[in-house]
Amino acid sequence: MEVVPAEVNSLLPDDIMDTAITLVDEDSIEAVIVSSPIPMETELEEIVNINSTGDSTATPISTEPITVYSNHTNQVAVNTTVSKADSNTTVKPAFPSGLQKLGAQTPVTISANQIILNKVSQTSDLKLGNQTLKPDGQKLILTTLGKSGSPIVLALPHSQLPQAQKVTAQAQPGDAKLPPQQIKVVTIGGRPEVKPVIGVSALTPGSQLINTTTQPSVLQTQQLKTVQIAKKPRTPTSGPVITKLIFAKPINSKAVTGQTTQASPPVVTGRVLSQSTPGTPSKTITISESGVIGSTLNSTTQTPNKIAISPLKSPNKTVKSAVQTITVGGMSTSQFKTIIPLATAPNVQQIQVPGSKFHYVRLVTATTASSSAQPVSQSPSVNTQPLQQAKPVVVNTTPVRMSVPFVQAQAVKQVVPKPINSTSQIVTTSQPQQRLIMPATPLPQIQPNLTNLPPGTVLAPAPGTGNVGYAVLPAQYVTQLQQSSYVSIASNSNFTGTSGIQTQARLPFNGIIPSESTSRPRKPCNCTKSLCLKLYCDCFANGEFCNNCNCTNCYNNLEHENERQKAIKACLDRNPEAFKPKIGKGKEGESDRRHSKGCNCKRSGCLKNYCECYEAKIMCSSICKCIGCKNFEESPERKTLMHLADAAEVRVQQQTAAKTKLSSQISDLLTRPTPALNSAGGKLPFTFVTKEVAEATCNCLLAQAEQADKKGKSKAAAERMILEEFGRCLMSVINSAGKAKSDPCAMHC
């Protein structure tokens, strides 16, 4: 037997001294025998109260063993004392842990006062009535079931609970404001015929036991063998509240929302949405049906500058200023703006009437021009017709509506709108003829033809534009197209806005036609770490995209155009002539090509592809800074290497042509139908080998194999017989073909 430590005895009441811990087996526990019936609810005499401030009343006590065991691996037996005072005696032990009140315990008389307690898992909760008993820690509250007794609080350490063989009784000073102590809920029972106890004490955050006096304990049995506190499933006191929101589709709602991007169907052109007297602001209400839940309906109040005016003859004053812009493309902010042409062929004029605070916009439509429009960013198409009277028409773009009048005009004056960004490019002319304003869509730009440009010229757009772009062209191209920042307008009537870019014919330079120079395949690059965005990448330096190269992690393609443009700009900032061809014409009057800056070879003798002159198959000139150069006309090494290089190139071309011809012939044989007749009109021999002939031949071969097996021939003899039979079959096929060739009529009969 193991003795309880001294700190345990010091925390227990003074009248309890004989306490020990004994490890017993579960098989040694005897059944609990109830000697007397349990009294009913009406037979309860009193409620035992425990007051923390009162003193304990000493009564004659006797020591009785109480066996406590757990469902876990270890079993603990505690010998404690049970007072045998009368039922009227009030026991008030002083507990510093803040226990103020103990619930009414049901008096149960058990022989030998043996009580079996089962420990509940930490995840279980016990709820009775409105009280919820939640285990928060490892503290055990044990009470005897006599008519009067002293409860014992056993606090088990967290780290030693599964392996503990000692019970430490701990009593801590209580404080009402401290967080709730960790209490371990225990159950009494574990035997068959379990009867639950209805009235159970609950713990408050102040570590107090409050009696559930509203519903006293009631036992519905006459005989009790084991008492167990029923384990209830955990019921949270406060759960999530589910709110169901039903959104109904608005039908006739006219709610006004200030800052909401509306999505409405296109408004029919020419529809009068407001009727008001002049001088008062008109209010246009557009009701749109949307399938998206939560969409709102906007009511747009038009400002007085959208009042329709009467037809004007000719404006008194034309102000050259920026045209009113509206947002497009579904943008909720107004930072992206562009000019929206309302029709294909109007001229926009902003009119300022002297002495008037209103701003008017007049659109003059041509009589013979078509009225199809192409707004920017996939706006709804608007078809406009010249109107005799000025009527407000709402042109529906996605976020903004603008009402403008259409009037007939007799005189036309030049108006040049200020472009907002690089995509809005509109220029008008001063000729009093039909005007055609190009829509601000990314159409192919009409670019002029520029001649007499050196090959490899780097082109930049006109200064003043926001976006700076570079067009790097290979050295073999002669035509250099300059990007213009405007769109020219044709004065004739048969002008089409979809004309392509015009290019000039390629001219021979340095005695070599571009088609001849491009016939030579470009050497693939082998870049690994430069992303093909450095000048030592031949593809990047020549202004070409990588194609069929051996590079890794390549950015020199259309998928990484932004990074490529940044690298080009960085190279041009360091050297404006970085992308110009290094092999160009010599001085005037010279037809030979020469290096523009010269090579700087030191150890290769200018006879390897490291030398740019040798790679271009030109000789080094006086401007080269090479050392030990052998790349001159009289050099035998150069002649030998050049001949070898030419021979190797010719051999590669021949091999490529042979492979191409062979593959084409094979594909031709596979796709070409098999001719059944020869040139003389006879049937070819292989056409006699049909499916039936093949099956008959196989049967003959199998028959020879079976015959050789029956005769007990050796393997070699059997193979000889099969081959001889196969030869006879082939000879019969050939003889049949010969007979058919000699007698053509037999083939047709």
Swiss-Prot record:
Residues 521-634 form the CRC domain. GO terms for molecular function: metal ion binding; minor groove of adenine-thymine-rich DNA binding; transcription regulatory region nucleic acid binding. It holds the Pfam family TCR. Keywords: Acetylation, Activator, Cell cycle, DNA-binding, Isopeptide bond, Metal-binding, Nucleus, Phosphoprotein, Repressor, Transcription, Transcription regulation, Ubl conjugation, Zinc. Zn(2+) 1 binds at C525, C527, C532, C537. The modification N6-acetyllysine is found at K244, K249. Zn(2+) 2 binds at C525, C539, C546, C549. Zn(2+) 6 binds at C606, C620, C626, C629. One of its GO terms (cellular component) is RNA polymerase II transcription repressor complex. The record marks Y536, Y610 as: Critical for interaction with target DNA. Zn(2+) 5 binds at C599, C613, C620, C624. Zn(2+) 3 binds at C532, C546, C551, C554. The modification Phosphoserine is found at S264, S282, S310, S314, S635. It is found in: Nucleus. The record marks R574 as: Interaction with DNA. Zn(2+) 4 binds at C599, C601, C606, C611. The keyword Iron does not apply. The CRC domain mediates DNA-binding. It contains two CXC subdomains (joined by a flexible linker) which are both required for efficient association with target DNA. Each CXC subdomain coordinates three Zn(2+) ions. Component of the DREAM complex (also named LINC complex) at least composed of E2F4, E2F5, LIN9, LIN37, LIN52, LIN54, MYBL1, MYBL2, RBL1, RBL2, RBBP4, RBL2, TFDP1 and TFDP2. The complex exists in quiescent cells where it represses cell cycle-dependent genes. It dissociates in S phase when LIN9, LIN37, LIN52 and LIN54 form a subcomplex that binds to MYBL2. Component of the DREAM complex, a multiprotein complex that can both act as a transcription activator or repressor depending on the context. In G0 phase, the complex binds to more than 800 promoters and is required for repression of E2F target genes. In S phase, the complex selectively binds to the promoters of G2/M genes whose products are required for mitosis and participates in their cell cycle dependent activation. In the complex, acts as a DNA-binding protein that binds the promoter of CDK1 in a sequence-specific manner. This is Protein lin-54 homolog.
